[in-house]
Amino acid sequence: MEIRDAGESDLPGLLTIYNDVIATSTAIYSYVPVTLEDRTQWWRARVAMGYPVMVATDASGVLGFSTFGDFRTWPGYRFTVEHSVHVRSDTRGRGVGKELVKALFPRAAALEKHVMIAGVDAANQASIRFHEQLGFERAGHLREVGHKFDRWLDLVFLQRWIGPR
C-alpha cells in the first residue's frame, strides 16, 4: 500500500468511495451522489488552499482517501482543521484509514495547525474507537443535529492536538 498526495487521475476512485459512503452510511450527512466534476472542483479547491488530499493505493486501485479543511471560517479558528477519511468498503479493518489519518498530522503541523477535529456519527462506535486509538479525545455530543435514512442523528466531536499545548 502506498500513501501519497492524490492526483487528478485518482478522482474517479475517490468518487466511487465517496458516493458509496453517501448511499450506505451515516458517515456523510448527505443524500445526493456527487459527480466527477464536483469532486474535481472540490479537489482543485483543496489544493489551491494548500490543504492535502491523501490517497491510499495498491494494485487494485484507490483504497481510501483523507483530507482536512477549515473547521470554521472566522479568523479565530484559523489554527483548527476538521478532517475526513473514507475507505473502500472491501478494505475496511486493514489499517488503511489509520495510515491515511496519520499522514495528515505532519501536513497539519507544517501548516501550523494546533487542533484537528473529527465529526463522527454517534452511533458509529467503531469510528469513535478508531479516532480514540489515534489520540483523539471526545469533546462534545450534539443531539439530533443530522437527519438521514428517516431518523435523527447525533454527532460526536473528537479533537486531537497537533502542536504543543
Q: Where in this protein do the model-derived segments appear?
A:
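Acetyl-CoA-dependent GNAT
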Residues: 5, 32-90, 101-102, 107, ...
